[in-house]
Amino acid sequence: MLNRYLDISTEVKEALEQGKPVVALESTIISHGMPYPQNVETAMNVEKLIRENGAVPATIAIIKGRLKAGLTAEEIDYLGRAGHAVPKASRRDLPVLVAKGSDGACTVTTTMMIAHMAGIQVFATGGIGGVHRGAETTMDISADLEELGQTPVMVQTIVQILSLPLLLEFSFVVSYHAVLDVSDHYYHHERMFHSVRFHSFHLNYNNYIDSP
């Protein structure tokens, strides 16, 4: 139903049609991650790095009620200048933002959703949300994990502040596989925990993958 509100940039659309690699990028880092103009400079540098490595970047956001897969430099600057005035958009927020014609900075959850709608299979981010320490009493569990269980988009790595044992338990509930981080030239079943220096947790599958 939301597909009719989806705008795929010409660059991204042509890359997908030609079978070129496309990498989705979130937009909360632009609006909420750092101040202007560093946020815009960082976003543009990330896109530049992706292009230099042979792929096409697709920064994802909601602008005036449209689901954007691939932003122009002007749209990135628009989000960067607006900053915290742009609300973070999770799955529950999409219908409201679309109906009101509002802007939204896409979290991991909505970036995955829109990437999948556009046909993008790989998503790069600083880290997904997860199960926070003490969640057995607070229920502080990120919507990112529910999305991982239902949206077939590859995304890398949890952040360090989370509870690894609770996260792995929750992964069984939503039925997703924690597999790898694709930032290096080797792949290992423990790479999900790349930002955690020491850990004693192991995943169920030890599979090596030649290509993302």
Identify what each model region corresponds to.
Residues 169-211:
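N-terminal low-complexity segments that are often proline-rich with Ser/Thr-Pro
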Residues 1, 90-101, 151-158:
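Short, basic, glycine/proline-bearing loop/turn elements
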Residues 1-19:
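N- or domain-start disorder-to-order transition segments that initiate the globular core
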Residues 14, 27, 32-34, 39-97:
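Glycine-rich nucleotide/cofactor/substrate-binding loop typically near the N-terminus or early
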Residues 118-171, 178:
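Phosphate/pyrophosphate-binding betaalpha-module
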Residues 20-23, 27-28, 55-61, 95, ...:
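Structural motif
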Residues 32-34, 60-77, 112-113, 117-118, ...:
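A glycine-rich phosphate/pyrophosphate-binding beta-strand-loop-alpha-helix module
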